[in-house]
């Protein structure tokens, strides 16, 4: 019988794991887990696909969050109930600064809370910030891999299209409150858009948990909107190598 409402997992299945790697894509969970020692499939229900693996004999759970803050909040809450205390998000992203290239790696220190889920945990004035130890581990891991990461602020939006001011849509329209925001975030030196970090950071900070995030750039919004499969694969591999190395450091 499951020990939590949605993930269909029990504490015994996690074997004492206190660190989770949380991608958005369920298929990415398997690809990450298979780079760990003794990977074991646990369960898949809705957007949540879970694996267990080991680094230097220590268990790590890999569990997909799905897209956006609401499902991320469920994943984090239920993994915390099962004993996880550190969350490393790995994702793909669209950069908005012209000097950031496709294939680059971004480490998020804080997020603009352009979402709704984080407001269910903390008031608007509360910042969405990553844990310092997690951020440092991700940065050092990237450098150790010969990767020069960009480090900074992310916009975290509930929606992929209007919230990120995309006009390549069925209607071609963006609600006026979001018109011009892309240029505003560029002027404020924000690196990129994604959809989970604001919920992850605010929730973990409020609950006394640790969270960090690394993302691979698969498009630059100043250049193109649609990525190609080869780029996604190569960029994902770089970001995954960083998150696994960071996990090892945080467990040591």
Curated annotation (Swiss-Prot):
This is Uridine phosphorylase. It is found in: Cytoplasm. PROSITE patterns: PNP_UDP_1. CDD domains: UP_EcUdp-like. It comes from Haemophilus influenzae (strain ATCC 51907 / DSM 11121 / KW20 / Rd). Its EC number is 2.4.2.3. Keywords: Cytoplasm, Glycosyltransferase, Transferase. One of its GO terms (biological process) is nucleotide catabolic process. The gene is udp. GO terms for molecular function: uridine phosphorylase activity. It comes from the Bacteria. Pathway: Pyrimidine metabolism; UMP biosynthesis via salvage pathway; uracil from uridine (phosphorylase route): step 1/1.
């Amino acid at each position: 019988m499951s020990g939590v409402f949605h993930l269909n997992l029990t504490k015994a299945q996690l074997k004492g794991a206190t660190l989770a790697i949380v991608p958005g894509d369920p298929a990415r969970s398997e690809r990450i887990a298979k780079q760990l020692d003794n990977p074991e499939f646990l369960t898949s229900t809705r957007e949540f696909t879970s694996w267990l693996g080991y680094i230097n004999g220590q268990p790590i759970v890999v569990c997909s969050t799905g897209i956006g803050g609401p499902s991320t909040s469920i994943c984090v809450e239920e993994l915390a109930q099962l004993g996880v205390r550190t969350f490393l998000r790995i994702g793909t992203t669209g950069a908005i600064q012209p000097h950031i290239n496709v294939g680059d790696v971004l480490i998020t220190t804080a997020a603009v809370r352009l979402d709704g889920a984080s407001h269910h945990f903390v008031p608007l004035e509360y910042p969405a910030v990553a844990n310092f130890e997690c951020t440092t581990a991700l940065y050092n891991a990237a450098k150790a891999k010969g990767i020069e990461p960009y480090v900074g602020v992310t916009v975290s939006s509930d929606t992929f299209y209007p919230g990120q001011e995309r006009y390549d849509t069925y209607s071609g329209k963006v609600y006026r409150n979001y018109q011009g925001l892309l240029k505003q975030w560029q002027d404020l030196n924000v690196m990129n858009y994604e959809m989970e970090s604001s919920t992850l950071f605010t929730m973990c900070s409020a609950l006394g948990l640790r969270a960090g995030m690394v993302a691979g750039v698969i498009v630059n919004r100043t250049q193109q909107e649609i990525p190609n499969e080869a780029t996604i694969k190569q960029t994902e591999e770089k970001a995954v190598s960083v998150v696994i190395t960071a996990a090892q450091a945080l467990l040591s």
